[in-house]
């Protein structure tokens, strides 16, 4: 069973409330297979993996926000390209 020192993760994020929010967002990504884990899974649950990633400094709130912005931009670009193609065909 993995041992995660939450105090080390709190020090990386700043406070325990931000830690909870960041870990929950990352765990949800892992659970839905939106992204691959950045640390070995070792048969751990997504919440433990998320905390280990935060503890190692691989994930933080800024990184999560940047990923979401990039995904939104890619989605918007794809939609605009589709609309453009529809207008070109008419």
From Swiss-Prot:
SUPFAM superfamilies: RPB6/omega subunit-like (SSF63562). Keywords: DNA-directed RNA polymerase, Nucleotidyltransferase, Transcription, Transferase. InterPro entries: DNA-dir_RNA_pol_omega, Pol_omega/Rpo6/RPB6, RPB6/omega-like_sf. Its EC number is 2.7.7.6. GO terms for biological process: DNA-templated transcription. One of its GO terms (cellular component) is DNA-directed RNA polymerase complex. SMART domains: RNA_pol_Rpb6 (SM01409). It catalyses: RNA(n) + a ribonucleoside 5'-triphosphate = RNA(n+1) + diphosphate. PANTHER family: DNA-DIRECTED RNA POLYMERASE SUBUNIT OMEGA (PTHR34476:SF1). Promotes RNA polymerase assembly. Latches the N- and C-terminal regions of the beta' subunit thereby facilitating its interaction with the beta and alpha subunits. The RNAP catalytic core consists of 2 alpha, 1 beta, 1 beta' and 1 omega subunit. When a sigma factor is associated with the core the holoenzyme is formed, which can initiate transcription. NCBIfam families: rpoZ. Belongs to the RNA polymerase subunit omega family. This is DNA-directed RNA polymerase subunit omega.
């Amino acid at each position: 069973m993995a041992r995660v020192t939450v105090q080390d993760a709190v020090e990386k994020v700043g406070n325990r409330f931000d830690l909870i929010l960041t870990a929950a967002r990352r765990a949800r990504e892992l659970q839905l297979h939106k992204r691959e884990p950045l640390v070995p899974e070792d048969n751990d649950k997504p919440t433990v993996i998320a905390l280990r990633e935060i503890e190692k400094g691989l994930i933080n709130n800024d990184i999560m926000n940047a990923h979401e912005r990039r995904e939104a931009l890619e989605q918007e670009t794809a939609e605009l390209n589709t609309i453009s193609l529809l207008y070109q065909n008419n």
